[in-house]
């Protein structure tokens, strides 16, 4: 079991501990539960889906990296496939506040970058901030997304974001988590190709500035993040953050990164290079390359 889970695990009910122990035994537990695993946990504990998700939130929050706030938020995004995806907030010493990741963004990106097609619900241990409510409104599940909070009745996103402004107001038809392929040729080594493939999946209907980041760890594992724009612009998630979300949730740490590649267009209206390289250097990665999409 990864050390970060030990304290939260010890506080779980005995029957949930017994059912989870073989799942969490792998140090690189992928911070997700398949539909089959969810069904097994429900049977072992007698909990329904909502109660089980609440019970698992401490494990999601244990994935948080919060050197600034020391305020850990956990989220579980429930995919329509039946898979549940953990998420947690992330803060980066030496970078800017704008580079931080919210738990809801983490869980949603985890699902999206894992190939999930849509979300049915999201469970969070604290009320989503306005930033996250706006981020969620970019999803193809839209204002119908169910939000579950401890001690409250579940409500749709529309109840948390009345009179919402979103992609439909800008006549955007392709939404976040819809399948997209921008068709750039995969060239270069494996890491470069991973970055280009991530750029091909970008959701960037507002700027038309595709980008993707791929991180290579010392053991050869590669994590890729795609750019995810938002109708309100500021809640946009950069591609580096997508890759860092996966790196963290899959049990790796910043010192494990040995090389990074950013893929973007040289003449795009928005350029990720400066922010990406500055944040990576703050995290200790200095081997950073840029591949131009063509």
Curated annotation (Swiss-Prot):
Gene Ontology cellular component list: cytosol
Catalytic activity: cytidine + H2O + H(+) = uridine + NH4(+); 2'-deoxycytidine + H2O + H(+) = 2'-deoxyuridine + NH4(+)
Protein name: Cytidine deaminase
InterPro entries (alphabetical): APOBEC/CMP_deaminase_Zn-bd, CMP_dCMP_dom, Cyd/dCyd_deaminase_Zn-bd, Cyt/Deoxycyt_deaminase, Cyt_deam_dimer, Cytidine_deaminase-like, Cytidine_deaminase_bacteria
Keyword set includes Heme: no
Tree of life domain: Bacteria
Cofactor: binding comment: Binds 1 zinc ion.
Biological role stated in the UniProt entry: This enzyme scavenges exogenous and endogenous cytidine and 2'-deoxycytidine for UMP synthesis.
List of residues binding Zn(2+): 102, 129, 132
CMP/dCMP-type deaminase domain: residues covered: 48-168, 186-294
Family: Belongs to the cytidine and deoxycytidylate deaminase family.
Quaternary data: Homodimer.
Residues bound to substrate: 89-91
Keyword Zinc part of the UniProt annotation: yes
GO BP: cytidine deamination
Gene: cdd
Entry EC number(s): 3.5.4.5
Cofactor: Zn(2+)
């Amino acid at each position: 079991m990864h050390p970060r889970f030990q304290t939260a695990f010890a506080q779980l009910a005995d029957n949930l501990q017994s059912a989870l122990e073989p799942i969490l035994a792998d140090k690189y537990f992928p911070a997700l539960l398949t539909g089959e695993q969810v069904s097994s946990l429900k049977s072992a504990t007698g909990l329904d889906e909502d109660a089980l998700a609440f019970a698992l939130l401490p494990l999601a929050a244990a994935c948080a990296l919060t050197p600034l706030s020391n305020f850990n938020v956990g989220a579980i995004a429930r995919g329509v496939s039946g898979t549940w995806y953990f998420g947690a907030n992330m803060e980066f010493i030496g970078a800017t506040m704008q580079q931080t990741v919210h738990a809801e963004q983490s869980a949603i990106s985890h699902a999206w970058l894992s190939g999930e097609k849509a979300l049915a619900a999201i469970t969070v241990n604290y009320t989503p901030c306005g930033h996250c409510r706006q981020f969620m409104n970019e999803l193809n599940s839209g204002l119908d997304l169910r939000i579950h909070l401890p001690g409250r009745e579940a409500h749709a996103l529309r109840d948390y974001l009345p009179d919402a402004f979103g992609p439909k107001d800008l006549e955007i038809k392709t939404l976040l988590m819809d399948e997209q392929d921008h068709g750039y040729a995969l060239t270069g080594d494996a890491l470069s190709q991973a970055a280009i493939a991530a750029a091909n999946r970008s959701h960037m209907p507002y700027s038309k500035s595709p980008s993707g980041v791929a991180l290579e760890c010392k053991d050869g594992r590669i994590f890729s993040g795609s750019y995810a724009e938002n109708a309100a612009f500021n809640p946009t998630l950069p591609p580096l953050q997508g890759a860092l979300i996966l790196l963290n949730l899959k049990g790796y740490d910043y010192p494990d990164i040995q090389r990074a590649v950013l893929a973007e267009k040289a003449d795009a209206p928005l350029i990720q290079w400066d922010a990406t390289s500055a944040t990576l250097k703050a995290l200790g990665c200095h081997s950073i390359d840029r591949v131009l999409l063509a």
